Amino acid sequence: VRIAVVGEPGGWSTERLAAALRAEGAEAAVVDLAVCALSLPAGGVAVGPRRLEGLDGAVVKKLGTSSARSTVGARINLLRALERSGVPVASAPERLAVAVDRYRMTLELAQAGLPMPETVVTDDVEEAVAAVRRFGTAVLKPLFTSKGRGMHRLRAGPDLVGILERHRADHGAPFYLQRFVPHPGRDLGVAVLGGRCLGAYWRVAAGDHWLTTILSGGRYAPAEPSPQVVEIAERAARHFGLLFTGVDLMETPDGGWVVLEVSAFGGFRGLGTALGLDAAPLVARAALARFSRPDRP
């Protein structure tokens, strides 16, 4: 069985997944979409002279390091082309395209009736300012980043328009604004494989930092969420139809929960650090099972 692991050559999680697939007896090679080419009408997706359409499957761990909208879109299109050549891809490119775009992801959360923070998306600076004033405190997020990159906590003030304009220059329009959810210095990550919870962990903020991400100095800690919270996470993951995902949730001051994000690519490090759980072999087996039944949702 020949499998491509789409990700970052030398990257810890990418190489860990490739090793797990090899341990299951697969011939696994890491494929970097940054060096792939699509030739049409004939030729398909290739890395140099090596064409990929004869593979038995492709597992997507990362799209690469760039969060530029055009780059992300181009790499999703490479995966679409690979899938159309007959190679099953996990997770499916159409589902990844929704999850990597924060705007589309939020539309899906709302459509599914999942609890989420109040959100405003607009190209207009005046509308953005009005949203910040209404929220009191807002979080401004780029559409195509993860791990807290490019996020700002905003309040109304004389520098607000300048911050919005700089954000637009750096990340483009529209402005994506959410009501800030006051929290006790942590949020919850739930890893979901094939629609079922693998485990959960807290991301605990450093000091009084409002961001809990590891890039902001946060740390992982084991968590045992209630069955009700697990059900919310599993429902969110199933709605997106991803093979392996992480669902980020935040507890609200009234004791409820909201879904912040559904990740296109579930992470291994939180499960390993907080719970001592090596998820790579589990993901490898799930991917191989899916490739043996390509009609499986």
Give the ranges of each region predicted by the language model.
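A long amphipathic alpha-helix within ATP-dependent nucleotide-binding catalytic cores
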Residues: 210-259, 270, 281-296
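Short acidic-glycine loop/turn motifs at beta-strand connectors
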Residues: 42, 192-196, 252-255
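Extreme N-terminal starter segment of soluble prokaryotic enzymes
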Residues: 1-4
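Conserved N-proximal alpha/beta basic substrate-recognition cap immediately N-terminal to
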Residues: 8-118
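Glycine-rich phosphate/pyrophosphate-binding beta-alpha loops
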Residues: 263-276
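Phosphate-binding site of ATP-dependent enzymes
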Residues: 149-240
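ATP-grasp fold ATP-binding core
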Residues: 106-110, 132-150, 172-183
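Rossmann-like NAD(P)H-binding beta-loop-alpha module
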Residues: 112-136
